[in-house]
Amino acid sequence: LGGTLLTDTGTRFFLELNYDPHPLYHYANIPFKAGIYASDLSIDWGDGTSSILKEKQYFNIVHHYQQEGLFHIKISGHRISNLNVSRLNLVDLQLEHCPSLEYLNCSINELKELDLSPCPALEELHCNSNNLQTLDLSSNPKLMQLNASYNLLETLDLSLCPKLQSLYCSFNHLTSVCLNHCRDILYI
């Protein structure tokens, strides 16, 4: 269960989310796990502890909480290009000013909305297994791979994604899929 805010102004991004270690059974010590490719990460875990990770690399960040509760996590750093926040029970993900973000995996959450307009470099998106009713990809012309299966989508317009090569959109309520200008599509 949580809200997320991610900002990359070209030099620094910010990620905020609310995380419940185990919302159904309320067991303590269930780890928070996410993957981020960026540099100079600073993390406030929301439980009085923090971490600093230097260098530009892919970080598999893991934190074990010793108590139950809802934790407000703040992550900041430089030059984010890859973000994996799957399986975190997120209900809100807000991306702001992320011009270098190329890969986003926010699958298996509880998202109802996803605004990707601030991410023009996005090439691969996994937003499957959420509660998305709409998905606007008109600002993502570099998108090559999309997995939007297992949502509540009724229409999907990919006409402004001319580089799209693979599309997974099964198990939705789709009545219309527009693939105009998607000449590179290899898999539907």
Placement of each model-derived feature along the sequence:
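Consensus "Asn ladder" position of solenoid repeat domains
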Residues: 88, 109, 130, 148-151, ...
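N-terminal capping/linker segments that flank leucine-rich repeat
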Residues: 1-102, 120, 141, 183
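Conserved hydrophobic beta-strand positions in leucine-rich repeat
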Residues: 83-85, 102-106, 123-127, 144-148, ...
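C-terminal helix/turn sub-motif of individual leucine-rich repeats
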Residues: 96, 115-120, 138, 159-162, ...
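Glycine- and aspartate-rich repeat motifs characteristic of hemolysin/RTX-like Ca2+-binding segments
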Residues: 90, 101, 111, 132, ...
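Canonical leucine-rich repeat
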Residues: 83, 93, 114, 135-137, ...
